[in-house]
Amino acid sequence: MNDSKFLNALELKPNSTPPIWFMRQAGRYLPEYQEIRKNYSNFLDMCKEPKTCAKLALQPIERFDLDASILFSDILTIPDALNLGLAFHEGEGPKFSNPISKPEDINTLISFDENTLSYVFNAVEETKKLLPADLPLIGFCGSPWTLAAYSIEGGGSKDFKKTKNFMQDHPSALHDFLEILCDACYRYLRQQVLSGVNALQIFDSWADLLSAQDLEIFSLQYTKKITQKLKSDPITKNIPIILFEKDPKQKITDLIFDDLSCISLHWKNDIEAISKSVKNNIAIQGNLNPMILSESDEIIYQEVQRICSIMFEYPGFIFNLGHGITPDINPQKVQTMIKAARE
């Protein structure tokens, strides 16, 4: 894949125009996705059908001019493999029937076995069969902290009060759980690479719940352990790693470490200031506010070209959203965004 704009950017090689992909590019805003989704009462059942996942991953590739595909799956597959009882029902977010509510629940967890997630690895293989040979596939996982937050809370939440209380009352038990998740994430990502992904992204979707100090203690140190293991492993050592931290309270420049190829910026982050601070030492991905896609074509053009002009001379720039695309977006607005970034 020597001619991949996306992989070139991750190696800090200049491109004539920035490579483009976007978070949740296969998803609910696409009518063709909805046609398949209506056949499943539980989203997770759909994720467990590799051929269906491959079709869904290809939908945005067939519709738009994109430079990378991302595996169609969910970040919560690891807690589900730990027997926490994950389910997604129409109109609801994720729910766990067996959440972590006390330290003893961690001691009685079943051992993580990546083979229970063979449906994910089969989805990688099926997706690679359908993708153009020159188009990279991104694999991913949630960060240990983000997976722990969902697992303790029992699902999504506005304030994650149960998780914060658990962190305050049982920090040692939480660290034990984070170690389990850390090892599981490494093994999970390693198997994705063996199955054919070309790059990896770690989503710390609940980084914003933590103070700057707690982010280092409960999140970053475990993310670093994952990347260190990946970079020490002959199977995965050459695979680029992207980190997405959602609106962290730490400076972004303090979140960059040697094993990362790319930092993916939340839309609230100042991409101009950050690009000047890191001085071409790491690829930067982002960071259009997804809400801009609800605006007029003129405003979309202005915002996209503002970001692209800031990053014009930055060799490792990947155009993306600063968070996942929302279900209400008209696909034609995505087309406008891509056209603006290509000019």
Where are these regions (language model features)?
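N-terminal small/glycine-rich loop or linker at the start of catalytic domains
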Residues: 14-45, 75-90, 96-102, 138-175, ...
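Short, glycine- and charge-enriched coil/turn segments that flank and shape catalytic ligand pockets
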Residues: 1, 39-40, 102-112, 172, ...
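N-terminal basic, low-complexity leaders that serve as flexible interaction/assembly modules and, when applicable
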Residues: 1-90, 225, 309, 329-343
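A gly/proline- and charged-residue-enriched helix-loop-helix capping module
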Residues: 91-130
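Generic structural hydrophobic/aromatic packing signal, biased to beta-strands
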Residues: 10, 20, 69, 96, ...
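Active-site loop segments of alpha/beta catalytic cores
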Residues: 116-343
